[in-house]
């Protein structure tokens, strides 16, 4: 930080983003990272983490010796057609809320703006093939955005602009919506969130 400040000009007071270790919420909080940082500019730091929990639902591409990838996530999506593909209940909406609350307590409430610089979950099955998977993807996006906003965090969906399966919300080439599940989850969250966070 001081190396940037020392270059002068606008860098002396530029807002700098500090990423947590591995952009991980628990590592950021556990290490009390911001207490170790010194900045000559007052109130010119913000923090960033990414959120892809639980990995088995959001981004795991194939089964591993230690576990299977999950197709279904959330309190309302436990009755999927494929056995053994439902996320562990400990990672449902309550977990998302608890993680975002950690960012509020440890950073937002202490005056640091908070970015959830990336989040997302892969749509694994073709839209319309499995209604419970579709609902899981939508509910995940809604839960992350709702909890982030309500806890003072600015969430940014990671849009890969890729081929299925992916985290693609928009097709940039055709300027069209690729995944209504994701977009509608975000839109519903923005409407229901408590603005501004307190």
Identify what each model region corresponds to.
Residues 1-90, 101-121, 150-151:
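Active-site region of glycoside hydrolase catalytic domains
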Residues 24-25, 92-93, 122, 164, ...:
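Alpha-helix initiation/capping motif
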Residues 83-93, 128-134:
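The substrate-binding groove and active-site-proximal loops of carbohydrate-active enzymes
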Residues 99-106, 140-144:
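A general structural detector for well-ordered alpha-helical segments in enzyme core domains, enriched
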Residues 126-198:
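Aromatic-rich peripheral "rim/lid" segments of glycoside hydrolase catalytic domains that contact
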